[in-house]
Amino acid sequence: MQMISPRMASGMQEKQYTPSLLSFFIYNPTFGPREGEEEKKILFYHPSDVEKNEKIRNVGLCEAIVQFTRTFCPTKPAKSLHTQKNRQFFFEPENNFWIVMVVRNPMIEKPNKDGKSQTIEYQEEEILDTVYGAVVRQCYSMYKLFNGTFARAMETGGVELLMQKLEKFFYKYLQTLHLQSSDLLDVFGGISFFPLDKMTYLKIQSFVNRVEESLSLVKYTAFLYNDQLIWSGLEQDDMRILYKYLTTSLFPRHTEPELAGRDSPLRPELAGNLLHYGRFLTGPLNLNDPEAKFRFPKIFVSAEDGYEELHLIVYKAMSAAACFMISASVELTRDFCEQLDKLVGPQLTLLASDICEQFTINRRISGPEKEPQFKFIYFNHMNLAEKSTIHMRKTASVCLTSVHPDLMKILGDINCDFARVDEDEEIIVKAMTDYWVVGKKSDQRELYVILNQKNANLIEVNEEVKKLCATQFNNIFFLD
């Protein structure tokens, strides 16, 4: 991606280029061990139009790097390779299956004084291994969510089936990667939870129990409001990647106007005396259509004996969404979908209304929101809870931030420091732009704060962070 910054006079401009994907490939070194069979190792290669010998050469180089680094650390070979122009990331998700992502470093194109030639400056220090390493792991997790493991495809249909699945999935998925907006949130891969009072939470729990009792086919349920999680019956790691898919891919494709409450229905349908405007986000677009297809995406989640395959039904009313997961061995029919629609639609509409009203009341009590002097990111490693006032909104795969990239880089650097040690610690940085950046790590929790107080000193900054902890995290203990 290119950004132009007009820093030079007389029509001469600097061009800034953000990080971009150069190549992405998956190989298994055991598939073509003999000379002349090297191409058999390559299971997927993007871009596909690269000449065959170049693919073989690039994969061979990666094999050599992995083997070389294995001599120093047999259990943890290469993770990344830094060069002036690009950075390579290595990940072995399953035995002998390697994923490699090559990212072009950000660069600045500067015109020379003669106006003809140009000087290129590569900014290799701007790329963080932790961030882009996390992006590679996300790619595999997303593939596994919809296809199961590489080994499963091999058992079912051999190398040919695996290559077909990789091509089908990654051809589309890699187009949604926006590497220029990857940051600390990719490292955490957390879940944003919706704050609720006990009474409303109990209503939701009761709703989930009623649905699972009435529709015995439903094995797991997840409940979200406004793209934030309220309830989940899945394991944490499964919910983490499903949440990523829902909030960055599925929901943005089905946006609808926000509703103020139950008095302003979008397209009300009466079901008895209850408003009903629930709809399927996966599966049939319109239940009244005689040609409607009752096919749902299948997902793979962890189970006691490895994994289980499930139908994913996502059903939405207003800003509330319920995900129902049903064993893939069951065939879902029109009758079942109509039964679900009739049962869930009115109840979900009412619940969405109640949550909206409760949220509005709470906001009124807390008073008008003033532009705070600080922005923060919070993450809890134990329950994957994540909260950010730095990220304004998510669109399909893009997270828009409200602070300068230089400050996001500092947050990433602090996170790298935290990852190196097990002890709790605090780091305070004064940025070149006069912002203060504070990182606190305490008892499996991390808090990052950006303060816009250029005249403050260390003591004042420390006091501000204490105030923030007292107001935003009053029930969470942070060590001083």
UniProtKB/Swiss-Prot annotation:
Its main location: membrane. The keyword Protease does not apply. It holds the Pfam family Intu_longin_3. InterPro entries: Ccz1, CCZ1/INTU/HSP4_longin_1, CCZ1/INTU/HSP4_longin_3, CCZ1/INTU_longin_2. Keywords: Lysosome, Membrane. It comes from the Eukaryota. It is found in: Lysosome membrane. GO terms for biological process: vesicle-mediated transport. The keyword Membrane applies. GO terms for cellular component: lysosomal membrane; Mon1-Ccz1 complex. PANTHER family: VACUOLAR FUSION PROTEIN CCZ1 HOMOLOG-RELATED (PTHR13056:SF0). Belongs to the CCZ1 family. This is Vacuolar fusion protein CCZ1 homolog. The gene is ccz1.
